[in-house]
Curated annotation (Swiss-Prot):
Organism: Influenza A virus (strain A/Swine/Iowa/17672/1988 H1N1)
GO molecular function, one term: structural constituent of virion
Subunit: Homodimer and homomultimer. Interacts with NEP. Binds ribonucleocapsid by both interacting with genomic RNA and NP protein. May interact with HA and NA. Cannot bind NP without genomic RNA.
Gene behind this protein: M
Lineage of the species this protein comes from: Viruses, Riboviria, Orthornavirae, Negarnaviricota, Polyploviricotina
Mitochondrion is among the record's keywords: no
Family: Belongs to the influenza viruses Matrix protein M1 family.
HAMAP family assigned: INFV_M1
GO CC term (a single one): membrane
UniProt-listed GO biological process terms: viral budding from plasma membrane
InterPro entries the record matches: Flu_matrix_M1, Flu_matrix_M1_C, Flu_matrix_M1_N, Flu_matrix_M1_N_sub1, Flu_matrix_M1_N_sub2, INFV_M1
Name of the protein: Matrix protein 1
Location in the cell: Virion membrane; Host nucleus
Amino acid sequence: MSLLTEVETYVLSIVPSGPLKAEIAQRLEDVFAGKNTDLEALMEWLKTRPILSPLTKGILGFVFTLTVPSERGLQRRRFVQNALNGNGDPNNMDKAVKLYRKLKREITFHGAKEVALSYSAGALASCMGLIYNRMGTVTTEVAFGLVCATCEQIADSQHRSHRQMETTTNPLIRHENRMVLASTTAKAMEQMAGSSEQAAEAMEVASQARQMVQAMRTIGTHPSSSAGLKDDLLENLQAYQKRMGVQMQRFK
């Protein structure tokens, strides 16, 4: 796996699923391929994106700044600086300085990532802030190692939280989660459907599913009534794809 592929993988792992994630993936691909060279426009676009947490925006801004060539005096962006200040915690800043000194001795991406993984996400973000604010310099490879370690720390905590939700025995939370998943699956089906005759069929199924979820929420239903909703939808989607000659069996 190439270095940039690895960076893209880690960064996208902390972006919530949805149309925005696809858009960010495209921007990252363009930046890494050298197709997008207007850093200012890119940062303005990033700043105004909804849904993303300030820290995720800060990390993306840091990656864009590392990758897109820019004039020496280009102004640093406040939204990135604020996100990478370790919540203003002096403890994070102390650790960030110690980490920075260690990173100065590293020359490889994997070496830097290994060193950085023993620090908390707050200290890692502060260290990125040091580099972003030009208070310290490391090679691009080492900076990318720091980025990936930070994303791994964040993705780990997100995964723990998702796992807690998936394994919860609370029937109301499970019910709501199934309805949310069914609704987002229906939305994805509508986006994929296109405009053929079979597409109308897929759109109809998706639309009915969304109406059903809406009705279930409006009148309040038994927590077990949502069981299998998403799977039924995915089966419909796969049947539609088969008719279109597309074989994708990996949605479940």
